């Protein structure tokens, strides 16, 4: 049998030799953007990687015949991001990818994320990342408020630090934080990101927070505070916010004519989540938030959990966590060491009201300046408990020689609110209109004697030296019951002319009232005079229609939570609480006793 090779034509020989060569023809057409790239490969392939640049996907540049990692540099003007796209186009997954990419390339000291998840709950899977300070959902309205308040507090604190240390730019501040010998190194916050997934729902459910987000978006970049927002329609994102979001990413829109980038977005294929267009007007395939090298969104929840664990294992530090208002704050927790009767008048009449939502510090009523307090709320909202706590705080600060109380307590809700020693000697407790009317007349006669004569000096007015005796607190629980039981003339009428001089004559008025009667109460000559004078007012839980106002937020709230309106502004607080007598809980005896 012959072993000679069969003869081949020249063409076959040439093709065989060319096929084995190392050099290949230039590929003009690259594969289509179909499969997403995992974050670990985005990080490895990102040749532009630098601090505060996050690799987020693959960008197709057909004119240059290139497909390279596309990312966002948040250190400059593009540090605020708007993401538009119809439902199920990949917006929430993009946010997950952004956070995981940032966490994979930065420490929890460098970047922190505070998230409001009003979408499909995808951001909840990132909660255990050390870079994430908190995630709030629509089922946690108080936590949503706190997330925004926390980020705004960072912005305000940065403004003060920049002013104090004459910092010229956020770039300089980042360098200062990296220097352990610089006071700025004590700042636990780096670049802070407020992430809101679902802007239309946010505006609809939290309209009072929109101005705060606008402030953060408009002012934050200069101080290293960023905003990232997703929306299904660009028209939902009003220009007052949209114009501050320098980076825009567009997934497939429900109406392609709404594009904010270019008509090229019409070419984004349907039913292809993750496909988008950037401001460079190139097509993108966004990555997926996984570190296992898998080019797929399958089993993404397990992949995210694994990625979160991998990143958490690398770090020992943690982003500052979102603090929330307590459901109940007791007076003794709020005011553990009250100043005593030996303190000066101003200190004794600085009375704690509750904890501020904005920064969780104590909110005070400066009763030496604004001597009254009004409390409006629906039944079971905590009106009487707050009045009880305020009365108790006043009594702890003042001796019986310094303050005395008169009560209008038709429901006996103020039992034990004021010690016997701090009650007026006569007419102190009034449970019906007959006794109250007589007591108020007598009180008015005595207080008129304290009106300042016309020839007093400023120093004498400040010292209140023309009269002596205790301040008087008129505590009225359930104002609506008092007015309903009265005739044509209010029992408080004799005190009405004295209210403008209340601070001079030592008169303080504390009133609780049903929220449904609040608007009518503020029209009353007595309560209305106190309200019109700018007295601190607590609006507890209620219906919006109970007190129609553009400036005052009345809505359903947990017991004790109130919208405080006062001379220093408006804010949400959790008011101080004391147990009523029937709820007092005694500690069990210790073992062996």
UniProtKB/Swiss-Prot annotation:
It is found in: Cytoplasm. It comes from the Bacteria. Disruption phenotype: Increases efficiency of DNA conjugation when disrupted in donor strain. Loss of secretion of EsxA and EsxB, but not their expression. SUPFAM superfamilies: P-loop containing nucleoside triphosphate hydrolases. Its main location: cytoplasm. It holds the Pfam family FtsK_SpoIIIE. GO terms for molecular function: ATP binding; ATP hydrolysis activity; DNA binding. Keywords: ATP-binding, Cytoplasm, Nucleotide-binding, Repeat, Transport. ATP binds at residues 85-92, 377-384. Coiled coil: none annotated. GO terms for cellular component: cytoplasm. Residues 66-260, 350-546 form the FtsK domain. Signal peptide: none annotated. Disulfide bonds: none annotated. SMART domains: AAA. DNA conjugation in M.smegmatis is unidirectional with distinct donor and recipient strains; mc(2)155 is a donor strain while MKD8 is a recipient strain. Mutations in a donor strain that alter DNA transfer do not always alter DNA transfer in a recipient strain. NCBIfam families: T7SS_EccC_b (TIGR03925). Part of the ESX-1 / type VII specialized secretion system (T7SS), which exports several proteins including EsxA and EsxB. Plays a role in DNA conjugation, in both donor and recipient strains. Part of the ESX-1 / type VII secretion system (T7SS), which is composed of cytosolic and membrane components. The ESX-1 membrane complex is composed of EccB1, EccCa1, EccCb1, EccD1 and EccE1. This is ESX-1 secretion system protein EccCb1. It comes from Mycolicibacterium smegmatis (strain ATCC 700084 / mc(2)155). The gene is eccCb1.
């Amino acid at each position: 049998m012959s072993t000679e090779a069969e003869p081949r034509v020249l063409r076959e020989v040439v093709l065989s030799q060319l096929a084995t060569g190392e050099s290949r023809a230039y590929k003009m057409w690259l594969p289509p953007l179909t499969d997403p790239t995992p974050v670990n490969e985005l990080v490895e392939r990102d040749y532009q990687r630098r601090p505060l640049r996050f690799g987020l996907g693959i960008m197709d540049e057909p004119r240059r015949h290139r497909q390279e990692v596309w990312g966002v540099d948040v250190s400059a003007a593009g540090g605020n991001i708007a993401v538009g796209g119809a439902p199920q186009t990949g917006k929430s997954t993009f946010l997950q990818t952004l956070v995981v990419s940032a966490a994979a390339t930065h420490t929890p000291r460098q970047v922190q994320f505070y998230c409001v998840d009003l979408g499909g709950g995808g951001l909840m899977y990132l909660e255990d990342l050390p870079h994430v300070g908190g995630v709030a959902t629509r089922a946690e309205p108080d936590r949503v408020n706190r997330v925004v308040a926390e980020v705004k507090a960072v912005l305000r604190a940065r403004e003060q630090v920049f002013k104090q240390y004459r910092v010229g730019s956020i770039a300089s501040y980042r360098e200062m934080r990296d220097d352990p010998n610089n006071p700025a190194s004590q700042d636990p916050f780096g670049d802070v990101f407020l992430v809101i997934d679902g802007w239309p729902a946010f505006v609809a459910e939290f309209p009072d927070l929109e101005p705060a987000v606008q402030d953060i978006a408009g002012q934050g970049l200069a101080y290293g505070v960023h905003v990232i927002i997703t929306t299904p329609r660009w028209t939902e994102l009003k220009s007052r916010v949209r114009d501050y979001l320098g980076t825009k990413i567009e997934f497939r829109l429900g109406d392609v004519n709404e594009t904010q980038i270019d008509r090229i977005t019409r070419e984004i294929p349907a039913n292809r989540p993750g496909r988008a267009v950037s401001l460079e007007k190139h097509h993108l395939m966004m990555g997926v938030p996984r570190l296992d090298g898998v080019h797929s969104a399958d089993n993404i929840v397990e992949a995210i959990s694994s990625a979160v664990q991998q990143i958490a294992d690398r770090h020992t530090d943690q982003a500052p966590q979102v603090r929330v208002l307590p459901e109940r704050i007791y007076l003794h927790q709020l005011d553990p060491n009250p100043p005593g009767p030996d303190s000066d008048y101003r200190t004794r009449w600085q009375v704690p009201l509750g904890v501020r939502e904005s920064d969780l510090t104590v909110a005070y009523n400066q009763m030496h300046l604004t001597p009254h307090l009004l409390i409006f709320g629906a039944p079971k909202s905590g009106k009487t408990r707050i009045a009880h706590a305020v009365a108790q705080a006043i009594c702890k600060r003042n001796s019986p020689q310094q303050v005395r109380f008169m009560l209008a307590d038709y429901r006996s809700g103020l039992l034990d609110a004021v010690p016997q020693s701090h009650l007026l000697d006569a007419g102190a407790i009034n449970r019906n209109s007959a006794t109250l009317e007589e007591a108020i007349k007598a009180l008015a006669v005595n207080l008129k004697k304290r009106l300042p004569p016309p020839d007093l000096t400023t120093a004498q007015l400040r010292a209140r030296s023309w009269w002596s005796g205790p301040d008087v607190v008129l505590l009225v629980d359930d104002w609506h019951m008092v007015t309903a039981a009265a005739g044509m003339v209010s029992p408080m009428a004799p005190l009405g002319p004295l209210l403008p001089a209340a601070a001079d004559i030592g008169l303080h008025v504390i009133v609780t009232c049903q929220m449904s009667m609040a608007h009518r109460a503020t029209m009353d000559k007595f309560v209305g005079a106190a309200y019109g004078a700018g007295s601190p007012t607590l609006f507890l839980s209620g219906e919006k229609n109970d007190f129609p106002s553009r400036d005052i937020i009345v809505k359903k709230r947990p017991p004790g939570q109130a919208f405080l309106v006062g001379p220093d502004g408006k804010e949400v607080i959790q008011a101080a609480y004391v147990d009523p007598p029937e709820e007092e809980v005694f500690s069990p005896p210790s073992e062996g006793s």
